[in-house]
Amino acid sequence: MILIAGFLRVPIWSSCKLSGSEGRIESILVQVSKLSSIQSNCDVGLIGLAVMGQNLVLNMADHGFRVAVFNRTYARTKSFMERCATEPCGGNVSAFETLDSFIKSLTRPRKVVMLVQAGDATEAIIRAVLPLLDEGDVLIDGGNALWSDTICREKELAGKGIHFIGSGVSGGELGARF
């Protein structure tokens, strides 16, 4: 079953699990229809829903973390939420179409993981998300950035009160998932 409603191009999707009368698990995608209902209740946010990002989100959700997700292309986000509906993620994944709504969904201090290509893509995400972050928030680059770029980013963001961690994620598709 899929329930879809719209509001100001700021859809928010959550995956929920319901037990059916026959012991089956049904997954439903629920879209919240009021912008004012955006609450800061996600433990961590992840930007970048390629294979590694998707599997890391599912891993965190399986372990009880409430995870907000954002991707540059919303079509990939919707596709991931359809996948999530078939996974035992326990309703712990929420997807956002805008960076602003994504950041607002995170509990403080906010923890944001980026799993995007090193270089220009990483830099673009940092520049886009930086005005939305506050002192004490944490930004983690899980890509394979050049070490000298990581040092420069850490220094720049520290000056703004943002904790920056450059820590490339490895282990492949299955390593991220399990």
Predicted feature descriptions by range:
Residues 29-97, 101-108, 136, 165, ...:
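NAD(P)+-binding Rossmann beta1-loop-alpha1 motif at the extreme N-terminus of oxidoreductases
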Residues 94-100, 119-126:
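Glycine-rich, highly charged phosphate/nucleotide-binding loops
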Residues 116-118, 144:
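Short glycine-/small-residue-rich Rossmann-like dinucleotide-binding loops
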Residues 122-127, 146-178:
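Rossmann-fold dinucleotide-binding core
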